[in-house]
């Protein structure tokens, strides 16, 4: 009797078994749980929450048959959440804090650092280290009285207290040299030497022991007292520092470093619009960023469209060669082209200035004059961007029916009329979304500015470092990493948040304007 094919049970391989699948998922779940707990214990709450959400969603999707379709979407969604949304949330969160090079620690860690500081209080003793078989002996000498003190033999390892006795002479044997002391510096730092009178001394330099005491003492009300000067300090959660207090309880001028991170609310955002040293360069840089992006988009589209029309011209011979030559700037990595142009535009030895000097007797100051520096940026960016627009236009030109040009030729239209009446209107509509994307890209064109001008020439009289060719993204970078008064990550994050809102608003306005124009 012939078996029904439906009755045949498909044999599973060992790697397709449910037991193996659930075992692997269980191990992954345990590993993720351990990592989340570890992150939470270290105070990295945002990382812990993100890891928990992404991992839980992934385990559910790949364990549940009903969510099979989501397996194709999950990698893209997880990537977007991890590399787009997570950095965005982190940036916005930092914008509401005073996080900077001077305020990186938590309050507890900053307090620990201050309490670990000590000051030298008491006599200074010269010390020597002498071998005693497999062990060592510590010898101290008082330079004022000439007395010598000697410890019993000991071995290095961990914190230990050595009782010293007065000795008439130094131990026999060769004194350890500086190399040996340097190699055992950490172990020597853990030794507390107790003198016959009960005073305790510790290593203060590579050749000396001295009496040390904690510089600060933590009082019951949370204030720190300087044991050397008697000044009291209280945590000021408005600025994130321990700050001195006067006798009447008011804040003094002295602040203790390191500081700690606190929430400052909208302070970083208000600084952008109220601090003249930040407001003036910010507004000027914003205007220049918009102008730079608009001019770049206009020139790259114009040059790319015209060249695309020329290389598509039927009467032109050798079109393939021209296409290859015109696309070459797009094939060369942009950072290489930018550095080559930086050499060509060199004010003293660049080929461009040599040629202009020979022809017209002028040598423009490409890097020291704001106007010529901006002109140079637009020239270089047009060179880098037109091949992309040309490739797009070459493809879109194929979609325009030849009947339109034949009909216009019968009406006596010329090449310019064909371009402005037929080609341009039919190309501009499909190009609009790409032009908006190009605008957003050039709005944040960090690499061009950083490699070609580094934002220069610099503006004078500003609170933060700013240059005439800086875009907003470069301005943010300089505040975060190149500030002369320290790296202000909170202010940089606030400006980055404003850039995000500005680019988003401009994109929405452009899309709505385009929709109104073509509807």
Swiss-Prot record:
Write down the SUPFAM superfamilies for this protein, in alphabetical order: MalF N-terminal region-like, MetI-like
Organismal lineage: Bacteria, Pseudomonadati, Pseudomonadota, Gammaproteobacteria, Enterobacterales
Gene responsible for this protein: malF
GO MF terms listed in the record are: ABC-type maltose transporter activity
Briefly state the protein's biological role.
Part of the ABC transporter complex MalEFGK involved in maltose/maltodextrin import. Probably responsible for the translocation of the substrate across the membrane.
Q: What is one Gene Ontology biological process annotated in the Swiss-Prot or TrEMBL record?
A: maltodextrin transmembrane transport
The record gives the membrane topology as: Multi-pass membrane protein
Query: What is the recorded name of this protein?
Result: Maltose/maltodextrin transport system permease protein MalF
Q: Which residues lie on this side of the membrane: Cytoplasmic?
A: 1-18, 63-74, 312-323, 398-417, 512-519
Subcellular locations according to the entry? Cell inner membrane
Q: How does it assemble?
A: The complex is composed of two ATP-binding proteins (MalK), two transmembrane proteins (MalG and MalF) and a solute-binding protein (MalE).
Transmembrane feature ranges: 19-41, 45-62, 75-97, 289-311, 324-346, 375-397, 418-440, 489-511
State the species of origin: Escherichia coli O6:H1 (strain CFT073 / ATCC 700928 / UPEC)
Q: Which GO terms describe its cellular component?
A: maltose transport complex
Start and end of every ABC transmembrane type-1 domain? 286-510
| UniProt xrefs under Pfam families | BPD_transp_1 (PF00528), MalF_N_TM (PF20872), MalF_P2 (PF14785)
Periplasmic side residue ranges read: 42-44, 98-288, 347-374, 441-488
Which keywords describe this protein according to UniProt? Cell inner membrane, Cell membrane, Membrane, Sugar transport, Transmembrane, Transmembrane helix, Transport
Write out the similarity annotation. Answer: Belongs to the binding-protein-dependent transport system permease family. MalFG subfamily.
């Amino acid at each position: 009797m012939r078996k029904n094919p439906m009755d045949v049970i498909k044999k599973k391989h060992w790697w397709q078994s449910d037991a193996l699948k659930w075992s692997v998922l269980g191990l992954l779940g345990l590993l993720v749980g351990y990592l989340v707990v570890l992150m939470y214990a270290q105070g990295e709450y945002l990382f812990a929450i993100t890891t928990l959400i992404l991992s839980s969603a992934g385990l559910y999707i790949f364990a549940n048959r009903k969510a099979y379709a989501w397996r194709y979407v999950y990698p893209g969604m997880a990537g977007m959440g991890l590399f787009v949304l997570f950095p965005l949330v982190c940036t916005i969160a930092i914008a509401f804090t005073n996080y900077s090079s001077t305020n990186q620690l938590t309050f507890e860690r900053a307090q620990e650092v201050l309490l670990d500081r000590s000051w030298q209080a008491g006599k200074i003793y010269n010390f020597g280290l002498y071998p005693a078989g497999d062990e060592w002996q510590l010898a101290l000498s008082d330079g004022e009285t000439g007395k010598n003190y000697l410890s019993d033999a000991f071995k290095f390892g961990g914190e230990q207290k050595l009782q010293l006795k007065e000795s008439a002479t130094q131990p026999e044997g060769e004194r350890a040299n500086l190399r040996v002391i340097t190699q055992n510096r950490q172990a020597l730092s853990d030794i507390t030497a107790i003198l016959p009178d009960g005073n305790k001394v510790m290593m203060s330099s590579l050749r000396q022991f001295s009496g040390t005491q904690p510089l600060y003492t933590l009082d019951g009300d949370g204030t720190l007292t300087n044991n050397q000067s008697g000044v009291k300090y209280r945590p000021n959660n408005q600025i994130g520092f321990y700050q001195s207090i006067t006798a009447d309880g008011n804040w003094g001028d002295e602040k203790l470093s390191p500081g700690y991170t606190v929430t400052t609310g909208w302070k970083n955002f208000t600084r952008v619009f109220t601090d003249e040293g930040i407001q003036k360069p910010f507004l000027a840089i914003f205007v220049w960023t918009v102008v730079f992006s608009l001019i770049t988009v206009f020139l790259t589209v114009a040059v790319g469209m015209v060249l695309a029309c020329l290389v598509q011209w039927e009467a032109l011979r050798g079109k393939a060669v021209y296409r290859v030559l015109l696309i070459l700037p797009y094939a060369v990595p942009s950072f290489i082209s930018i550095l080559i142009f930086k050499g060509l535009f060199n004010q003293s030895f660049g080929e461009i200035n040599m040629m202009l000097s020979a022809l017209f007797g002028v040598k423009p100051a490409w890097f020291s004059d704001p106007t010529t520096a901006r002109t140079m940026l637009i020239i270089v960016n047009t060179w880098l961007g037109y091949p992309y627009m040309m490739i797009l236009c070459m493809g879109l030109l194929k979609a325009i029916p030849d009947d339109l040009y034949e009909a216009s030729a019968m009406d006596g239209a010329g090449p310019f009329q064909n371009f402005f009446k037929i080609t341009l209107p039919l190309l501009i509509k499909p190009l609009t979304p790409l032009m908006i994307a190009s605008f957003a890209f050039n709005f944040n064109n960090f690499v061009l500015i950083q490699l070609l001008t580094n934002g220069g020439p610099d503006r004078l009289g500003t609170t933060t470092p700013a240059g005439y060719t800086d875009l907003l993204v470069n301005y943010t970078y300089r505040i975060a990493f190149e500030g002369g008064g320290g790296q202000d990550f909170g202010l940089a994050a606030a400006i980055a948040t404003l850039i995000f809102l500005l680019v988003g608003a401009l994109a929405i306005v452009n899309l709505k304007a385009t929709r109104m124009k073509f509807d």
